[in-house]
C-alpha cells in the first residue's frame, strides 16, 4: 500500500515538473474565475477497519450458562472499492475554493476471527471469516487551497469533513457497523486544464466509533456471541484516489 501511494505521488510530481519547464498556451484561461461550477467524480478507494479487541470476556449461551471467550478480530488487508458522485464548487478567492461532493462508496471488507479458547487438530486457534459488504452515501465538505496556475496545471491541497451513512448490514454477520460515521479528509491533487481534469489522492480517518455495540443484544444465534463480542470499538480508514471532471 505504501509503495502504491508513493508511486502515485511520484507520477503526479514528475508530470508537474515536466510541464513546468516552459510557458505554453493556456487552455480554458477563464475557467477558475467562475463563481460556481458543477462536475462529476469517479475513483477507487482502499478501506480498513482498526479494531480494539475485547480480550477475555463472558457470555450467556443458549442454555443459560455463563461461558468465557477470547476471540480476536482483524481486517488483515486493505480492501478495494469504487466511488461515484457529483460535486459543486464555490470560488472564494484566487486561491481558496469550497467544495460539496455527494458520493457513493461501494466495497467489501474481509474480517478474520481467531478463537483463542478453541484449537483445531494441529493446535492453532479456530479461524472464522466474515465478508462484510459496504455501501456508504456521503456528502464531503472540503476547503481547497490552490497554488497559482502555471501553464495548464495547478496543484492544490485540501481538507474537510465527510459524514457518511452506512446503507449495508446483515443480521447474520458476526460484526455490524453503525449507520452513521464522520471522516476527516486530508489530501492533495492537481488541476489539468485540457477539459478540467482533477486527480486527487486523499486520506480519510473515522472520527467516531463505527462498531455497533447494540447489535450484541440482537443476535439470535447465541453461538455467534463469542465472535460478536470480540471487539469493543472500531475506526474506519480509507485511502481514496478520485478523478474529478468539470
Predicted feature residues:
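Acidic/histidine-enriched, beta-strand-rich ligand/metal-binding domains
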Residues: 97, 106-109, 146-154, 162-167, ...
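Predominantly the C-terminal beta-signal and adjacent terminal strand-loop region
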Residues: 179, 189-246
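Residues on the lipid-exposed face of transmembrane beta-strands in outer-membrane beta-barrel proteins
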Residues: 40-44, 82-90, 102-104, 137-147, ...
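Flexible, solvent-exposed loop segments that connect beta-strands
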Residues: 50-75, 108-134, 167-177, 211-231
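Bacterial Sec-dependent N-terminal signal peptides
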Residues: 1-25, 243-246
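Residues that define the transmembrane beta-barrel architecture of outer-membrane proteins
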Residues: 34-36, 78-82, 133-139, 153, ...
Amino acid at each position: 500500500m505504501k509503495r502504491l501511494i508513493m508511486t502515485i505521488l511520484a507520477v503526479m510530481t514528475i508530470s508537474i515538473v515536466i510541464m513546468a519547464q516552459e510557458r505554453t498556451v493556456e487552455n480554458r484561461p477563464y475557467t477558475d474565475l467562475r463563481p460556481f461550477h458543477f462536475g462529476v467524480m469517479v475513483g477507487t478507494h482502499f478501506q480498513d477497519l482498526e479494531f480494539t479487541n475485547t480480550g477475555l470476556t463472558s457470555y450467556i449461551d443458549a442454555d443459560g450458562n455463563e461461558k468465557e471467550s477470547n476471540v480476536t478480530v482483524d481486517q488483515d488487508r486493505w480492501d478495494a472499492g469504487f466511488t461515484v458522485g457529483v460535486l459543486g464548487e464555490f470560488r472564494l478567492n484566487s486561491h481558496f475554493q469550497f467544495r460539496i461532493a455527494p458520493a457513493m462508496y461501494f466495497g467489501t471488507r474481509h474480517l478474520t476471527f481467531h478463537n483463542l479458547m478453541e484449537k483445531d487438530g494441529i493446535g492453532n486457534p479456530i479461524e472464522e471469516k466474515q465478508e462484510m459488504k459496504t455501501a456508504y452515501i456521503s456528502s464531503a465538505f472540503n476547503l481547497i487551497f490552490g497554488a497559482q496556475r502555471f501553464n495548464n496545471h495547478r496543484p492544490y491541497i485540501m481538507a474537510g469533513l465527510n459524514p457518511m451513512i452506512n446503507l449495508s448490514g446483515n443480521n447474520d454477520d458476526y460484526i455490524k457497523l453503525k449507520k452513521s460515521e464522520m471522516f476527516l479528509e486530508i489530501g492533495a491533487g492537481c488541476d489539468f486544464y485540457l477539459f478540467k481534469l482533477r486527480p486527487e489522492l486523499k486520506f480519510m480517518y473515522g472520527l467516531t466509533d463505527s462498531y455497533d455495540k447494540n447489535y450484541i443484544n440482537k443476535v439470535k444465534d447465541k453461538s455467534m456471541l463469542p465472535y460478536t463480542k470480540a471487539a469493543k470499538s472500531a475506526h474506519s480508514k480509507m485511502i481514496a484516489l478520485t478523478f474529478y471532471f468539470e
